Amino acid sequence: MTRNSYLKALLVMAMVLFLASCHRDEDAPRLSLKQQQTFSHAIAGSYSGSYAVVYTDSLTTYEKVHEVQPDGSVKEMVAHNAHSETVADARLLITDDGKLYFHNFPCRLLAKIVDVDADLSQALSEFGSIDVTAQYKFFYENTEFVGWSFEPLNLPLTLNYRNERHYIRIAFSNANRFYRFPMKDLESGSFHFESETALQVEAIYEGEQLLQSFTSFDGLGNSMLITFK
């Protein structure tokens, strides 16, 4: 076989695999629009609770370990001198149009991990509470359970320090967490939201400029995990 023939054969094989993959995706079970609407109505509501906040900063030290977790994953780092705080009177609002609101999020907590700029940190410590908005979606998991996840939107803040107005943006993630709910409860209307819902602080920007990025809780560096429970 010539080199050109070999390359053509590889190209054809790659196309076949690509088309087969697309075909499998098209055949995968999906939730209907009616199901998604039913599930959104079932999950919608206002839920009272508290924020359990865990964070690491410059005082935190780390130890390498090899611990097998119940889910089979391996934990390779343990944080010492991490900090925790509980914020009462928190509220989670879930609407039936795909929105999720973490009410009364205390921005002062961000000052505990932002150390790139002392004036910025001070301004955050004096800022009041604000709502963090997210968008959620359902996805098919199996005939018994429905998957659910959300994506936090950037949180815009206008702060005044050094005699100037600064347009700050906080980026969050869902801490790579996914949730599963019994399909029969969502369909019957007997569902009650009881999941511990987590936000992880990812980065802080001024405009498009990255000021400071943060790690996951078991990583090296400043981090913050906020769990509504």
Which sequence ranges carry the predicted segments?
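Short hydrophobic/aromatic-rich beta-strand segments that constitute the beta-sheet cores
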Residues: G49, F102-H103, F193-S195
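Bacterial Sec-dependent N-terminal signal peptides
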Residues: T2-L11, V16-S46, K229
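Short, cysteine-centered beta-strand-loop-beta hairpins and adjacent loop/turn segments enriched
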Residues: V54-T60, R108-V116, L199-S216
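Tryptophan-anchored aromatic micro-motifs
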Residues: S40-V65
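Predominantly extracellular/secreted and cell-surface proteins with exposed
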Residues: A88, L92-L186
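Edge beta-strand at a domain terminus
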Residues: P29, A171-N174, F178, D185-K229
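Mature soluble binding/inhibitory domains
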Residues: L33, Q37, E63-G72, V78-K112, ...
